[in-house]
Amino acid sequence: SIPAAAVSQGAAEALVAAAEDGEPARLVTDAHTEQARTRTVLAELPGSADGQVIMLGAHLDSVIDGPGINDNGSGVAALLEIARALGGTRPQATVRMAFWSGEELGLHGSMRYVATLAQSEKDAILVYANVDMIASPNGFAGVYDEPGAAVGSATASELLGAAVTRNGGTPVQVNLHG
């Protein structure tokens, strides 16, 4: 494994200059690490059709240097508002909301969740929408579609893009790989 650490802009520039001069780099850290147990919270509104799940998710944690209100308090607030709006309804597909733990440190909550699902449970998920950082004043109406994603992802991206357009926005397709 290759160790990594966050450094200041000045330290980064000094490291780059040293590397360009052929000097070896040395990184000394004084860090404390510990194992911690976290919890992912799942909420579900049962639908009338068996074997159909629409899934929405938002992560509960934030980066150490961020206030968390946008990343990702805004996504969590949106899911709670969606849950409130759906209260008392009976949708066709089951609506499952996941409030993920450990996202900023490596997608731990969502990766663990998916790893514990039986294939039939995975197959029942029609679409998953991740709600993250939606309150940024510098935001944009973006639709991320991963190449090679599950069947139906392209259709979901098209539908989300159409919804953005209907609401007066211009959806931006974002390439996650370059």
Language-model segments: residues:
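Metal-dependent peptidase/peptidase-like ectodomains
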Residues: 2-14, 51, 64, 90-91, ...
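Short amphipathic alpha-helical face segments that pack within enzyme cores
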Residues: 73-81, 108, 112
